């Protein structure tokens, strides 16, 4: 997966709490088992006015021209609650998002996001509100997420620190998912396998 060190990008806010995985990617779009192709269905019931997804909702932030190309999502508490579907971080990443900033995340979503190279950043509610207000007030405003130094920088230059388990931080910095982490020990695995007697293989 793509490594995450420091990312600066356009931020977009969905000022709602308890955004669940069925809102992130509705169940009717879960038939695929590969990670690509889900971005078009992200927030389907909010982004579109029709079931077919042909009529964009002009009032939804992700459809507004000023937020086109946004790579950082701001949201309220308990983001990613609901079912454990891994398609939720797949859809967010396939849409082009690199980081989600919210006061709290559902535990399973939080882990799934990290495992798929999507950085979930927990900040105090007041910090998230300041970021939302600055982004709303300044078209084209960019936010920086610095994983190396564990800080977020607002459009005005305000800095907010966040925490992340060191193992997760290192995996994201190096772009290692579960498979990549295993392959990093390929030499040791091969050496161990070479010592297994033939009759036990």
From Swiss-Prot:
One of its GO terms (molecular function) is 3-isopropylmalate dehydratase activity. GO terms for cellular component: 3-isopropylmalate dehydratase complex. Transmembrane segments: none annotated. It catalyses: (2R,3S)-3-isopropylmalate = (2S)-2-isopropylmalate. It holds the Pfam family Aconitase_C. Its EC number is 4.2.1.33. The keyword ATP-binding does not apply. GO terms for biological process: L-leucine biosynthetic process. Keywords: Amino-acid biosynthesis, Branched-chain amino acid biosynthesis, Leucine biosynthesis, Lyase. PANTHER family: 3-ISOPROPYLMALATE DEHYDRATASE SMALL SUBUNIT (PTHR43345:SF5), 3-ISOPROPYLMALATE DEHYDRATASE SMALL SUBUNIT 2-RELATED-RELATED (PTHR43345). Heterodimer of LeuC and LeuD. Belongs to the LeuD family. LeuD type 1 subfamily. This is 3-isopropylmalate dehydratase small subunit. It comes from Shewanella amazonensis (strain ATCC BAA-1098 / SB2B).
